[in-house]
Protein backbone atom coordinates (compact mmCIF):
# COMPACT_ATOMS: atom_id res chain seq x y z
CA UNK A 1 0.00 0.00 0.00
CA UNK A 2 1.26 3.47 -0.94
CA UNK A 3 0.38 6.79 0.70
CA UNK A 4 -2.74 8.19 -0.97
CA UNK A 5 -2.99 11.90 -1.82
CA UNK A 6 -6.28 13.71 -2.48
CA UNK A 7 -5.95 15.88 -5.59
CA UNK A 8 -7.82 19.20 -5.61
CA UNK A 9 -10.74 20.05 -7.84
CA UNK A 10 -11.96 23.63 -8.18
CA UNK A 11 -15.45 24.07 -6.79
CA UNK A 12 -15.54 20.73 -4.98
CA UNK A 13 -12.68 20.18 -2.52
CA UNK A 14 -12.88 23.34 -0.44
CA UNK A 15 -12.06 23.29 3.27
CA UNK A 16 -15.48 22.09 4.46
CA UNK A 17 -15.41 19.07 2.15
CA UNK A 18 -11.82 18.21 3.09
CA UNK A 19 -12.61 18.37 6.80
CA UNK A 20 -15.74 16.27 6.42
CA UNK A 21 -13.90 13.62 4.40
CA UNK A 22 -11.02 13.49 6.87
CA UNK A 23 -13.40 13.20 9.83
CA UNK A 24 -15.65 10.47 8.45
CA UNK A 25 -13.38 8.48 6.14
CA UNK A 26 -9.69 9.45 6.17
CA UNK A 27 -7.08 7.17 4.66
CA UNK A 28 -5.47 10.19 2.98
CA UNK A 29 -1.92 11.34 3.72
CA UNK A 30 -2.32 14.82 2.20
CA UNK A 31 -5.19 16.97 1.00
CA UNK A 32 -4.26 19.62 -1.59
CA UNK A 33 -6.08 22.92 -1.96
CA UNK A 34 -7.47 24.01 -5.30
CA UNK A 35 -4.68 26.12 -6.77
CA UNK A 36 -4.23 29.56 -5.27
CA UNK A 37 -3.54 32.21 -7.90
CA UNK A 38 -2.58 35.85 -8.23
CA UNK A 39 -5.56 37.79 -9.55
CA UNK A 40 -6.38 41.49 -9.80
CA UNK A 41 -3.43 42.56 -7.69
CA UNK A 42 -3.61 39.95 -4.97
CA UNK A 43 -5.00 36.65 -3.71
CA UNK A 44 -8.74 36.08 -3.73
CA UNK A 45 -10.21 36.35 -0.23
CA UNK A 46 -11.99 33.00 -0.55
CA UNK A 47 -8.68 31.30 -1.36
CA UNK A 48 -7.12 32.66 1.82
CA UNK A 49 -10.19 31.68 3.86
CA UNK A 50 -9.82 28.19 2.42
CA UNK A 51 -6.35 27.76 3.96
CA UNK A 52 -6.97 29.37 7.34
CA UNK A 53 -5.62 26.94 9.96
CA UNK A 54 -8.87 27.14 11.93
CA UNK A 55 -10.75 25.89 8.86
CA UNK A 56 -8.44 22.91 8.44
CA UNK A 57 -7.99 21.48 11.92
CA UNK A 58 -7.08 17.81 11.80
CA UNK A 59 -6.52 17.90 8.03
CA UNK A 60 -3.00 17.25 6.63
CA UNK A 61 -3.17 20.18 4.20
CA UNK A 62 -0.81 21.22 1.41
CA UNK A 63 -1.58 24.59 -0.20
CA UNK A 64 -1.13 24.48 -3.97
CA UNK A 65 -0.19 27.52 -6.05
CA UNK A 66 -0.18 28.29 -9.76
CA UNK A 67 2.11 30.99 -11.16
CA UNK A 68 3.43 32.26 -14.47
CA UNK A 69 6.71 33.59 -13.13
CA UNK A 70 8.74 34.64 -10.12
CA UNK A 71 6.68 37.72 -9.16
CA UNK A 72 3.46 35.74 -8.82
CA UNK A 73 5.31 32.85 -7.21
CA UNK A 74 6.90 34.99 -4.50
CA UNK A 75 3.68 36.88 -3.76
CA UNK A 76 1.77 33.64 -3.28
CA UNK A 77 4.48 32.01 -1.18
CA UNK A 78 4.59 35.02 1.14
CA UNK A 79 0.82 34.97 1.61
CA UNK A 80 0.84 31.25 2.42
CA UNK A 81 3.88 31.36 4.70
CA UNK A 82 2.23 34.15 6.69
CA UNK A 83 -0.44 31.59 7.62
CA UNK A 84 2.23 29.31 9.06
CA UNK A 85 2.55 26.75 6.26
CA UNK A 86 5.87 25.08 5.54
CA UNK A 87 4.67 22.97 2.59
CA UNK A 88 3.69 24.34 -0.82
CA UNK A 89 2.87 22.48 -4.02
CA UNK A 90 3.57 24.18 -7.36
CA UNK A 91 1.06 23.35 -10.07
CA UNK A 92 2.80 22.80 -13.42
CA UNK A 93 0.10 20.48 -14.71
CA UNK A 94 -3.19 22.40 -14.96
CA UNK A 95 -4.46 22.21 -18.56
CA UNK A 96 -7.26 24.79 -18.22
CA UNK A 97 -7.02 27.33 -21.06
CA UNK A 98 -7.86 30.20 -18.68
CA UNK A 99 -4.58 29.45 -16.89
CA UNK A 100 -2.33 28.17 -19.66
CA UNK A 101 -2.97 31.26 -21.81
CA UNK A 102 -1.36 33.22 -18.97
CA UNK A 103 1.68 30.95 -19.02
CA UNK A 104 0.64 29.03 -15.92
CA UNK A 105 0.15 25.34 -15.19
CA UNK A 106 1.21 22.92 -17.90
CA UNK A 107 2.24 25.83 -20.16
CA UNK A 108 5.35 26.14 -17.97
CA UNK A 109 6.56 22.79 -19.30
CA UNK A 110 7.33 24.42 -22.64
CA UNK A 111 9.30 27.20 -20.91
CA UNK A 112 12.17 25.55 -19.02
CA UNK A 113 13.88 28.93 -18.57
CA UNK A 114 10.96 30.09 -16.42
CA UNK A 115 10.99 26.80 -14.51
CA UNK A 116 14.67 27.46 -13.80
CA UNK A 117 13.84 30.93 -12.47
CA UNK A 118 11.13 29.47 -10.23
CA UNK A 119 13.56 26.81 -9.02
CA UNK A 120 16.02 29.52 -7.97
CA UNK A 121 13.27 31.18 -5.96
CA UNK A 122 12.49 27.90 -4.22
CA UNK A 123 16.07 27.70 -2.99
CA UNK A 124 15.59 31.15 -1.41
CA UNK A 125 12.89 29.73 0.84
CA UNK A 126 14.63 27.09 2.97
CA UNK A 127 11.78 27.05 5.50
CA UNK A 128 9.38 25.69 2.87
CA UNK A 129 9.41 22.18 1.48
CA UNK A 130 8.13 22.30 -2.07
CA UNK A 131 6.60 19.65 -4.28
CA UNK A 132 5.64 19.88 -7.94
CA UNK A 133 2.61 18.55 -9.80
CA UNK A 134 3.19 18.28 -13.54
CA UNK A 135 2.35 16.59 -16.82
CA UNK A 136 4.57 15.06 -19.46
CA UNK A 137 4.53 18.32 -21.36
CA UNK A 138 2.41 21.10 -22.77
CA UNK A 139 2.32 20.18 -26.47
CA UNK A 140 4.78 17.28 -26.67
CA UNK A 141 5.06 14.27 -24.33
CA UNK A 142 8.84 14.55 -24.03
CA UNK A 143 9.02 18.17 -22.82
CA UNK A 144 9.60 16.87 -19.31
CA UNK A 145 13.13 15.92 -20.39
CA UNK A 146 14.06 19.62 -20.38
CA UNK A 147 12.41 20.25 -17.02
CA UNK A 148 13.38 17.23 -14.92
CA UNK A 149 17.12 18.08 -14.75
CA UNK A 150 16.16 21.47 -13.28
CA UNK A 151 13.92 19.82 -10.68
CA UNK A 152 16.68 17.36 -9.80
CA UNK A 153 18.67 20.29 -8.39
CA UNK A 154 15.97 20.98 -5.80
CA UNK A 155 15.24 19.22 -2.47
CA UNK A 156 11.63 18.49 -3.42
CA UNK A 157 9.29 16.49 -1.19
CA UNK A 158 8.09 14.72 -4.34
CA UNK A 159 6.93 15.13 -7.92
CA UNK A 160 3.40 14.18 -8.92
CA UNK A 161 3.08 13.13 -12.56
CA UNK A 162 -0.11 13.00 -14.60
CA UNK A 163 0.94 11.28 -17.85
CA UNK A 164 -0.97 13.38 -20.36
CA UNK A 165 0.07 16.57 -22.13
CA UNK A 166 -1.57 19.88 -21.40
CA UNK A 167 -3.37 20.34 -24.70
CA UNK A 168 -5.09 16.97 -24.16
CA UNK A 169 -6.73 18.33 -21.04
CA UNK A 170 -8.46 15.12 -19.80
CA UNK A 171 -9.16 13.58 -23.19
CA UNK A 172 -7.57 10.49 -24.68
CA UNK A 173 -5.47 7.94 -22.86
CA UNK A 174 -2.71 8.40 -20.33
CA UNK A 175 0.72 7.73 -21.89
CA UNK A 176 2.04 4.93 -19.72
CA UNK A 177 5.05 4.27 -21.97
CA UNK A 178 6.28 7.82 -21.48
CA UNK A 179 5.39 7.67 -17.80
CA UNK A 180 7.67 4.66 -17.44
CA UNK A 181 10.50 6.63 -19.04
CA UNK A 182 9.89 9.43 -16.52
CA UNK A 183 9.64 6.92 -13.67
CA UNK A 184 13.02 5.45 -14.58
CA UNK A 185 14.77 8.82 -14.79
CA UNK A 186 13.16 10.65 -11.87
CA UNK A 187 15.40 10.82 -8.81
CA UNK A 188 12.79 12.43 -6.58
CA UNK A 189 10.05 10.52 -4.75
CA UNK A 190 7.36 10.08 -7.41
CA UNK A 191 3.58 10.12 -7.04
CA UNK A 192 1.35 8.82 -9.83
CA UNK A 193 -1.86 10.65 -10.79
CA UNK A 194 -4.28 10.00 -13.63
CA UNK A 195 -7.43 7.94 -14.30
CA UNK A 196 -7.41 6.17 -10.93
CA UNK A 197 -11.03 5.20 -10.26
CA UNK A 198 -11.08 1.85 -8.45
CA UNK A 199 -9.17 -0.31 -6.00
CA UNK A 200 -8.06 -2.41 -8.98
CA UNK A 201 -6.60 0.70 -10.61
CA UNK A 202 -4.62 1.49 -7.47
CA UNK A 203 -3.36 -2.08 -7.18
CA UNK A 204 -2.38 -2.21 -10.85
CA UNK A 205 -0.28 0.96 -10.76
CA UNK A 206 1.27 -0.04 -7.45
CA UNK A 207 2.26 -3.42 -8.94
CA UNK A 208 3.58 -2.02 -12.24
CA UNK A 209 5.61 0.74 -10.58
CA UNK A 210 6.70 -0.59 -7.18
CA UNK A 211 9.16 2.26 -6.51
CA UNK A 212 6.43 4.91 -6.48
CA UNK A 213 6.27 6.87 -3.25
CA UNK A 214 2.53 7.48 -3.50
CA UNK A 215 -0.67 7.64 -5.52
CA UNK A 216 -2.96 10.62 -6.08
CA UNK A 217 -6.68 10.51 -6.78
CA UNK A 218 -9.01 13.38 -7.60
CA UNK A 219 -12.23 12.66 -9.47
CA UNK A 220 -12.00 8.98 -8.53
CA UNK A 221 -12.02 9.87 -4.84
CA UNK A 222 -14.81 12.39 -5.25
CA UNK A 223 -16.83 9.70 -6.99
CA UNK A 224 -15.99 7.01 -4.42
CA UNK A 225 -15.20 8.93 -1.21
CA UNK A 226 -14.81 5.71 0.78
CA UNK A 227 -12.10 4.28 -1.49
CA UNK A 228 -9.30 5.82 0.57
CA UNK A 229 -10.42 3.89 3.67
CA UNK A 230 -10.93 0.73 1.62
CA UNK A 231 -7.42 1.05 0.19
CA UNK A 232 -5.90 1.70 3.62
CA UNK A 233 -7.61 -1.35 5.12
CA UNK A 234 -7.21 -3.59 2.08
CA UNK A 235 -10.92 -4.46 2.30
CA UNK A 236 -13.75 -3.46 -0.02
CA UNK A 237 -16.75 -2.24 1.96
CA UNK A 238 -20.28 -3.56 1.68
CA UNK A 239 -22.63 -1.28 -0.25
CA UNK A 240 -24.64 -0.41 2.87
CA UNK A 241 -21.48 0.68 4.71
CA UNK A 242 -20.57 2.92 1.78
CA UNK A 243 -24.04 4.43 1.76
CA UNK A 244 -24.06 5.04 5.50
CA UNK A 245 -20.72 6.84 5.64
CA UNK A 246 -21.54 8.97 2.60
CA UNK A 247 -24.86 9.95 4.18
CA UNK A 248 -23.00 11.01 7.33
CA UNK A 249 -20.72 13.13 5.15
CA UNK A 250 -23.78 14.54 3.43
CA UNK A 251 -25.41 15.48 6.73
CA UNK A 252 -22.34 17.51 7.72
CA UNK A 253 -22.13 19.08 4.27
CA UNK A 254 -25.82 20.02 4.47
CA UNK A 255 -25.26 21.60 7.87
CA UNK A 256 -22.35 23.64 6.47
CA UNK A 257 -24.47 24.83 3.53
CA UNK A 258 -27.36 25.79 5.81
CA UNK A 259 -25.01 27.88 7.96
CA UNK A 260 -23.57 29.65 4.92
CA UNK A 261 -26.63 30.18 2.73
CA UNK A 262 -30.04 31.63 3.56
CA UNK A 263 -32.57 30.18 1.16
CA UNK A 264 -33.40 26.57 0.34
CA UNK A 265 -32.69 27.28 -3.33
CA UNK A 266 -29.16 28.45 -2.49
CA UNK A 267 -28.56 25.41 -0.30
CA UNK A 268 -29.84 23.11 -3.04
CA UNK A 269 -27.54 24.72 -5.61
CA UNK A 270 -24.51 24.23 -3.37
CA UNK A 271 -25.27 20.73 -2.14
CA UNK A 272 -25.92 18.99 -5.45
CA UNK A 273 -22.22 18.98 -6.51
CA UNK A 274 -21.59 16.66 -3.53
CA UNK A 275 -23.20 13.89 -5.61
CA UNK A 276 -22.02 14.87 -9.07
CA UNK A 277 -19.18 12.36 -9.40
CA UNK A 278 -20.86 9.57 -7.40
CA UNK A 279 -23.07 8.12 -10.13
CA UNK A 280 -20.86 5.03 -10.54
CA UNK A 281 -22.08 3.36 -7.34
CA UNK A 282 -25.52 4.88 -6.72
CA UNK A 283 -28.62 3.42 -8.34
CA UNK A 284 -29.34 5.33 -11.54
CA UNK A 285 -32.91 6.29 -10.60
CA UNK A 286 -31.90 7.60 -7.17
CA UNK A 287 -28.93 9.48 -8.62
CA UNK A 288 -31.17 11.16 -11.17
CA UNK A 289 -33.64 12.19 -8.45
CA UNK A 290 -30.82 13.70 -6.39
CA UNK A 291 -29.41 15.71 -9.28
CA UNK A 292 -32.71 16.71 -10.91
CA UNK A 293 -34.64 17.78 -7.81
CA UNK A 294 -36.18 21.18 -8.47
CA UNK A 295 -36.99 21.92 -4.85
CA UNK A 296 -35.33 21.28 -1.53
CA UNK A 297 -38.32 19.21 -0.42
CA UNK A 298 -38.00 16.88 -3.42
CA UNK A 299 -34.27 16.66 -2.82
CA UNK A 300 -34.74 15.52 0.78
CA UNK A 301 -37.31 12.97 -0.41
CA UNK A 302 -34.64 11.54 -2.71
CA UNK A 303 -32.18 11.46 0.20
CA UNK A 304 -34.71 9.52 2.26
CA UNK A 305 -35.21 7.00 -0.54
CA UNK A 306 -31.47 6.57 -0.81
CA UNK A 307 -31.10 6.02 2.94
CA UNK A 308 -33.88 3.39 2.89
CA UNK A 309 -32.26 1.27 0.20
What are these model-derived regions, one by one?
Residues 41-43, 169, 224-230:
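Short, charged, surface-exposed secondary-structure boundary motifs
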Residues 77-88, 92-97, 102, 113-188:
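Alpha/beta enzyme core
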Residues 9-79:
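Glycine-rich, positively charged N-terminal anion/phosphate-binding segment
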Amino acid sequence: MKPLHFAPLQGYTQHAYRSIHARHIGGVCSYYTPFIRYEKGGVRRKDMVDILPENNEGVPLVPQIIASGTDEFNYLCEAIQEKGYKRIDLNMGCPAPMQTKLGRGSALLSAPQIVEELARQMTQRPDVRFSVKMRLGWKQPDEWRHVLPILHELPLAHITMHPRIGIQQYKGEVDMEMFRAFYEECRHPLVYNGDLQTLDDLARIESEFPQLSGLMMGRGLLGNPFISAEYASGTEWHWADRRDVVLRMHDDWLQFCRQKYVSDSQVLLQIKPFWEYQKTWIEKKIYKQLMKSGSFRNYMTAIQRFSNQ
